[in-house]
Amino acid sequence: MNHKKLYIDTVGCQMNVNDSERIVTMLQPLGYTQTSRRHEAALILFNTCTVRAGAEECLLQNIANLKNLKRKKPGTLIGVAGCVAQQMGAELLQKFPWVDLVFGTHNLHLVPEMVKDAEAGRRRAETDFLDSSERLDLFPPIEGRKRVSAFVTVMQGCDNFCSYCIVPYVRGREISRRFAEILQEVQDLAAQGLREVVLLGQNVNSYGLKGEEQPSFAELVRAVAAVSGIDRVRFVTSHPKDMSDDLIACFADLAKLCGSLHLPAQAGNNRILKAMNRGYSREHYLETIYKLRQARPEIKITGDMIVGFPGETEAEFEETLSLMEEVRYFDLFSFVYSPRPGTKAAELSDELAKEVKLARLDRLQKLQAVHSRIHNETYVGSTQQVLVEGLAKRHGQVSGRCDSGRIVNLAGSPALIGKLVDVKILEGYANSLLGELL
């Protein structure tokens, strides 16, 4: 077999990471192996995100920069996948004549065929959405996973249509994967020696809510936690309105379910939340946090915040800061509002000045830096169970995660990879911890 190199530049959410892993698996029969060196690749793929304008602009610039490479190495294939591909489709082929293939979020199953066409000189774009029955059969297994932890897709798409968000338009409507199929994949991963699974979906805790004859997401979490050989279970990303009491009870009942949860609030003011079409109030969100901490007192909450939504007043922004003070997020991903074409919010006329949005983002991030530092300082001197995942950047160290998901680096040999070890935490940094093996 002719061995060829595949380079994938993946940005965006965990679903994109998972899709890239599936693409690697699907192209192996064609002789492609993944490389981290773009210059040696026979096929360069961009798996893209369009949630914010900046990511889309960066992608278009990256493609433009490959014009000279294509001129020097005309045999190199260039492709675009993911949400920008879904949104722009054949327009990318027209705009960039050196791009060979474009495939959307429902078209991963066509990748081998499209690559063969590209190798034969036939350019192609595929962005058709599939119906739910067709999509149910398009969860190909990911082969050759040598890591300690793995994503397992349980649902795709989103039905929430938050006013600022383009995801439902580029990922499609929600569909829940078959319960038995998910459990079989988890059992197969356990048999391969993986120790942790992360249940994945755009709106993971809406699994089974759309009239499908499926168990609830809480029942799925309990079933996955019961699989022998799996030591840790996580799930991402959750929507506050779908955080059921049964699911919250899992944090009290299941030792394998890690004590961390990503629960995006997006804003702290009720008028803004309603304008965003989030489907819950500030009070409901805080009640959910209270219930979670009753179930698992040490649970670490992470979240997302959007700053500068159209019409946001100073007083409304202050309510976001006060929500942060009440929740005390472990980590927070924060962004300036970015209008996306086709969304309801993009039609609003009262967008804030850029300097106002940036100033508010700076204030928010400084507050979160204080909270994150306090969280990290509480670890110093404690003993944490760490699942070692791989080598650290520093020579002689390995890296893993404690129950909260925080990265822990420690001196140790590669023989520790895949093991759960007790570690004493020596120092806390902005985004990681330093420990020593006990």
UniProtKB/Swiss-Prot annotation:
GO terms for molecular function: 4 iron, 4 sulfur cluster binding; metal ion binding; N6-isopentenyladenosine methylthiotransferase activity. Binds 2 [4Fe-4S] clusters. One cluster is coordinated with 3 cysteines and an exchangeable S-adenosyl-L-methionine. Its EC number is 2.8.4.3. It is found in: Cytoplasm. Its main location: cytoplasm. It holds the Pfam family UPF0004. Residues 4-120 form the MTTase N-terminal domain. [4Fe-4S] cluster 2 binds at residues 158, 162, 165. Keywords: 4Fe-4S, Cytoplasm, Iron, Iron-sulfur, Metal-binding, S-adenosyl-L-methionine, Transferase, tRNA processing. Residues 144-377 form the Radical SAM core domain. Its cofactor is [4Fe-4S] cluster. InterPro entries: Elp3/MiaA/NifB-like_rSAM, Methylthiotransferase, Methylthiotransferase_CS, Methylthiotransferase_N, Methylthiotransferase_N_sf, MiaB_methiolase, rSAM, rSAM_horseshoe. GO terms for cellular component: cytosol. [4Fe-4S] cluster 1 binds at residues 13, 49, 83. Residues 377-438 form the TRAM domain. It catalyses: N(6)-dimethylallyladenosine(37) in tRNA + (sulfur carrier)-SH + AH2 + 2 S-adenosyl-L-methionine = 2-methylsulfanyl-N(6)-dimethylallyladenosine(37) in tRNA + (sulfur carrier)-H + 5'-deoxyadenosine + L-methionine + A + S-adenosyl-L-homocysteine + 2 H(+). Belongs to the methylthiotransferase family. MiaB subfamily. Catalyzes the methylthiolation of N6-(dimethylallyl)adenosine (i(6)A), leading to the formation of 2-methylthio-N6-(dimethylallyl)adenosine (ms(2)i(6)A) at position 37 in tRNAs that read codons beginning with uridine. Monomer. This is tRNA-2-methylthio-N(6)-dimethylallyladenosine synthase.
